[in-house]
Amino acid sequence: MARQTYNYHVTHFVTSAPDIRHLPEDTGIEVAFAGRSNAGKSSALNTLTNQKSLARTSKTPGRTQLINLFEVEDGIRLVDLPGYGYAEVPEEMKRKWQQALGEYLQKRQCLKGLVVLMDIRHPLKDLDQQMIAWAVEVGLPVLLLLTKADKLASGARKAQLNMVREAVLPFMGDIQVDAFSSLKKFGVDKLRDKLDTWFSEITPQQADKDDDPSIGE
């Protein structure tokens, strides 16, 4: 099937949900964005969609406590998962977030890809590795975006990229690693290309046909 290209600039907010049970129907295709509270996840979504405030950026990390859904077009959604790993969030709340994240990654059938964002200077913290492990466990492809890449000189950036690529080999999953900078618009094309690929693998129309037993009888 030929790969489609999508216009991410028309992406719009649909709804927020505290957990998987409150999400809309499990149809179409979703790609989720996950990352530590200060990894630049909201900034990356805003850069991708060319909208300054699609995903709210907060000066106080850890504010995104809900699963936020955005629609690119009918049946094609980007999902902003709760930021994790912020020290000042109470333990009970942390546990709830991690449970919601794990449940979403492992049970949401329309989820077709996971983007994990990590500060290029501090990659692969324990919770980042947990997200990757959950995704690989269910056969989900992963794009690791090393954010804030403008903070490092070219040589150091390449060294970090190579280090992370080596470090994720033991996960044995479909994992791609790229550098990204919202500030310099660095890596946006690669992100867009990967999303186009994931969203083109099965169209919502095909998904509906697959679900309808009367078709093809």
Curated annotation (Swiss-Prot):
Residues annotated as binding GTP: 35-42, 62-66, 80-83, 147-150, 180-182
Binding residues for Mg(2+): S42, T64
GO MF: GTP binding; metal ion binding
Segments forming domain EngB-type G: 27-201
Keywords: Cell cycle, Cell division, GTP-binding, Magnesium, Metal-binding, Nucleotide-binding, Septation
Gene Ontology CC annotations of this record: cytosol
Pfam (any one): MMR_HSR1
Source organism, top-level taxon: Bacteria
Keyword 4Fe-4S among UniProt keywords: no
One GO BP: division septum assembly
Cofactor: Mg(2+)
Similarity field: Belongs to the TRAFAC class TrmE-Era-EngA-EngB-Septin-like GTPase superfamily. EngB GTPase family.
Task of the protein: Necessary for normal cell division and for the maintenance of normal septation.
Identification of the protein by name: Probable GTP-binding protein EngB
Species for this entry: Edwardsiella ictaluri (strain 93-146)
